[in-house]
């Protein structure tokens, strides 16, 4: 299935039904009084996050989503039926923005999360509501309210734990296909990867994490060159970035250090928060480098690149070094989750301390 990560739709809620101005008509009841019912509520348009959907392609072709109007009220105090709601199923990770105001309406981060995109109009009152001691035969009624109408922009940010960075042909697709269940297209020409790929890496029966591979970046990507800039937003939710570098390019004139610096510069131009994420250096294609030259080439790269963070040496093709990298990622993600859990627990601890400082009469000490 084609991966679509952006779409524009129009959500149109139903109008509320009009209230009825009706009077009770019955034999031997000459002054039956008002009995006009209210109009029904207009249908609303909802979005629901569904983990079984991974693309916005359906919304490229179905752009207008209209809920039904509420029915008008009738006599005999009959209320109009409410209009049917429309529910749109979207991938987990979808951002929904109002195109007219720029307001972020929803960020669908959990399966089953439901949000109202356009609210249906309220039904109007029938004349039964206007009866009083001074107005025994009211003829006024209220029309239903119009439903909301919104132009919406949908953006999908994939929910991955680890994101892969690198130039085209750095070996990202080969790496993700070796360590996970993903099977991206792999070939010896640039931009083989044209859309993001997700792979689930199973460390054991109980532990796994998700890796996102995006099209390779080139210099000028932040200004729109190449393909990768379109998909950099998919890395914003990750907890770790792996910067994969081709240490043995086919073209001997290509400098791996210059290419690595170019990637980091593009990352910084695009988003400072993305640049500040934890980032590991992964030196790939060591199987192509003669064994006696490996240590020298790696040492020279790190020195010229001025890198002080974690470094991993792998061959995505043969799998050398991949196992050690996978377990290091697992430990890093576990530490991140532990930090998040501790941060969430802190307010509860402060609350407990405050409760212990209250005397028997309910006054704080």
Swiss-Prot record:
OBG-type G domain boundaries: 160-334
Gene3D superfamilies named among the record's database cross-references: GTP1/OBG domain, P-loop containing nucleotide triphosphate hydrolases
Superkingdom, taxonomy of origin: Bacteria
Compartments where located: Cytoplasm
Binding site for GTP: 166-173, 191-195, 213-216, 284-287, 315-317
InterPro entries reported for this sequence: G_OBG, GTP-bd, GTP-bd_Obg/CgtA, GTP1-OBG_CS, GTP1_OBG_dom, GTP1_OBG_dom_sf, OBG_GTPase, P-loop_NTPase
Domain Obg span(s) in chain numbering: 1-159
GO biological process entries: ribosome biogenesis
Enzyme Commission (EC) number: 3.6.5.-
Listed cofactors: Mg(2+)
Keywords: Cytoplasm, GTP-binding, Hydrolase, Magnesium, Metal-binding, Nucleotide-binding
One Pfam family this sequence matches: MMR_HSR1
PANTHER family cross-referenced by the UniProt entry: DEVELOPMENTALLY REGULATED GTP-BINDING PROTEIN-RELATED (PTHR11702), MITOCHONDRIAL RIBOSOME-ASSOCIATED GTPASE 2 (PTHR11702:SF31)
Stated name of the protein: GTPase Obg
């Amino acid at each position: 299935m084609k991966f679509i990560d952006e779409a524009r739709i129009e959500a149109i809620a139903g109008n509320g039904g009009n209230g009825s101005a009706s009077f009770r008509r019955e034999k031997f009841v000459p002054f039956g009084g008002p009995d006009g019912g209210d109009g029904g509520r207009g249908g609303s348009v909802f979005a629901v996050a569904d983990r079984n959907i991974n693309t916005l392609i359906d919304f490229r072709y179905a752009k207008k989503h209209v809920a039904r109007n509420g029915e008008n009220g009738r006599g005999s105090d009959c209320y109009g039926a409410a209009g049917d709601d429309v529910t749109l199923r979207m991938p987990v990770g979808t951002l929904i923005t109002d195109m007219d105001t720029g307001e972020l309406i929803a960020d669908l981060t959990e399966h089953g999360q439901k949000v109202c995109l356009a609210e249906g109009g309220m039904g109007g009152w029938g004349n039964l509501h206007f009866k009083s001691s001074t107005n025994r035969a009211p003829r006024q009624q209220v029309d239903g309210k119009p439903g909301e109408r919104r132009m919406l922009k949908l953006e999908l940010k994939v929910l991955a734990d680890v994101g892969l960075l690198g130039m085209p042909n750095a070996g990202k697709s080969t790496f993700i296909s070796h360590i996970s269940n993903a099977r991206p297209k792999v070939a010896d020409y640039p931009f083989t990867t044209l859309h993001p790929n997700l792979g689930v890496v199973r460390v054991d029966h109980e532990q796994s994490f998700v890796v996102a591979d995006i099209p390779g970046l080139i210099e000028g990507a932040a200004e729109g060159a190449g393909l990768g800039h379109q998909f950099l937003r998919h890395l914003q939710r990750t907890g770790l970035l792996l910067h994969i570098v081709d240490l043995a390019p086919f073209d001997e004139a290509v400098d791996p250090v210059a290419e690595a610096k170019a990637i980091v510069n593009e990352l910084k131009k695009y988003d400072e928060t993305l640049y500040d994420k934890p980032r590991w250096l992964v030196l790939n294609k060591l199987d192509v480098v003669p064994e006696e030259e490996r240590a020298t080439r790696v040492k020279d790269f790190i020195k010229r690149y001025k890198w002080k963070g974690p470094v991993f040496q792998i061959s995505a093709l043969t799998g050398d070094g991949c196992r050690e990298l996978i377990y290091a990622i697992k430990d890093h993600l576990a530490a991140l989750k532990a930090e998040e859990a501790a941060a969430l627990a802190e307010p509860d601890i402060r609350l407990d301390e405050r409760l212990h400082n209250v005397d028997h009469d309910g006054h704080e000490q």
